[in-house]
Amino acid sequence: MKVYIETMGCAMNSRDSEHLLSELSKLDYKETSDPKMADLILINTCSVREKPERKLFSEIGQFAKIKKPNAKIGVCGCTASHMGADILKKAPSVSFVLGARNVSKISQVIHKEKAVEVAIDYDESAYAFEFFEKKAQIRSLLNISIGCDKKCAYCIVPHTRGKEISIPMDLILKEAEKLANNGTKELMLLGQNVNNYGVRFSSEHAKVGFSDLLDKLSEIQGIERIRFTSPHPLHMNDAFLERFAQNPKVCKSIHMPLQSGSSAVLKMMRRGYSKEWFLNRVERLKALVPEVGISTDIIVGFPNESDKDFEDTMEVLEKVRFDTLYSFIYSPRPFTEAGAWKERVPLEISSLRLERLQNRHKEILEEKAKLEVGKTHVVLVENRREMDGQIVGFEGRSDTGKFIEVTCKEKKNPGELVRVEIISHSKGRLMATTKGN
């Protein structure tokens, strides 16, 4: 039996797809990259914005046309959670619907016609996803929590993934050790608010915080680097930032989702912090780790966002000079506070704001890239670079999250840590050669 999985959206969804495959492997399913050959087609969905949700029904239609006569189509993930049985009504070719909090039930629902399992109070945190042998990965994803207790006015995630629960540390360490034994060098820890880890477990467990978890993971032999996403700025107190700075295996790059640079908009968004708080946290972080790489999310066109509000966002962009920017026009979502508001920023204005934001960020990246020439970084080799069938180097990321293309004559294998020197840049991209390895 063969399964094809189409994954939309975030890293959390990618990890959920791995869990789906893990469960199905117990029933002797093998993954295929060709949906035409699959006995089971799974679409793991995203509902953070409207666009991927619209794409879902287009994908269902395409798969229905090309699938084998008896193949089943299942819709999983966040859109499944909030649309539930409505998906079956809109797309009769779908055999079952499986919500984001119900991944472990996949082996049950594939045997039920028109099944709908979308309860968000189902506790998957106590479920030990069994490690299954797969192709060795240099970088692996690892859940440390599920759900979200925040009530951001624009976000549907609490409705699709339920209340926040931390996964017991012993299960996390056990899986991390198995990943390390299978060749993983870098862990990416996943959670809606990873740095809030330990606030609530599904059952009685010894109190442990996120920084303690990072320290324990750092002790695992074979794990060279640890990253995490997505932390919440509200939980970036001095103690957390100091532990982040001190742990040598924790990469010195961090995601700090700003969302807006306007304190007024942040208040409407129910983010719990102000522009001043955010800038204070960045200042403290850079004092501890001057070379830190910072990425962020920004939403433009949030209801009632004024010209001044947007200028506040541009001001924060100039002050922080983010290394990576994920930026979007506000998308109203069902079951959210802001989704019910009548006030809307005209699309033309939102589009112009987004264009200006992104263009300025591109300029900032170019300015920062110029300053990198002559500097050295340690890169984790991810892929070899080839030209005319010959290996000419490799590419990978630095500790600070910079993607670097390296030219070298020596053969370097994926998973190696290699010191390189930046020699040039192009449109924000960094090029390097090996140095003193």
From Swiss-Prot:
Source species: Helicobacter pylori (strain J99 / ATCC 700824) (Campylobacter pylori J99)
Keyword field contains Transcription: no
HAMAP family in alphabetical order: tRNA_metthiotr_MiaB
Binding site for [4Fe-4S] cluster 1: 10, 46, 78
CDD domains in alphabetical order: Radical_SAM (cd01335)
Protein task: Catalyzes the methylthiolation of N6-(dimethylallyl)adenosine (i(6)A), leading to the formation of 2-methylthio-N6-(dimethylallyl)adenosine (ms(2)i(6)A) at position 37 in tRNAs that read codons beginning with uridine.
Reaction(s) this enzyme catalyzes, per UniProt: N(6)-dimethylallyladenosine(37) in tRNA + (sulfur carrier)-SH + AH2 + 2 S-adenosyl-L-methionine = 2-methylsulfanyl-N(6)-dimethylallyladenosine(37) in tRNA + (sulfur carrier)-H + 5'-deoxyadenosine + L-methionine + A + S-adenosyl-L-homocysteine + 2 H(+)
Cofactor annotation comment: Binds 2 [4Fe-4S] clusters. One cluster is coordinated with 3 cysteines and an exchangeable S-adenosyl-L-methionine.
InterPro entries: Elp3/MiaA/NifB-like_rSAM, Methylthiotransferase, Methylthiotransferase_CS, Methylthiotransferase_N, Methylthiotransferase_N_sf, MiaB_methiolase, rSAM, rSAM_horseshoe
Keyword Cell inner membrane attached: no
Subunit details: Monomer.
MTTase N-terminal domain mapped to chain residues: 1-115
PROSITE patterns (alphabetical): MTTASE_N, MTTASE_RADICAL, RADICAL_SAM, TRAM
One Gene Ontology cellular component annotation held by this UniProt entry: cytosol
GO molecular function, one term: metal ion binding
Residue sites binding [4Fe-4S] cluster 2 per the record: 148, 152, 155
Keywords: 4Fe-4S, Cytoplasm, Iron, Iron-sulfur, Metal-binding, S-adenosyl-L-methionine, Transferase, tRNA processing
Compartment(s): Cytoplasm
EC number: 2.8.4.3
UniProt cross-references to SUPFAM superfamilies, sorted A to Z: Radical SAM enzymes (SSF102114)
Major enzyme class: transferase
Protein name per UniProt: tRNA-2-methylthio-N(6)-dimethylallyladenosine synthase
Family membership: Belongs to the methylthiotransferase family. MiaB subfamily.
Domain called TRAM: residue spans: 370-436
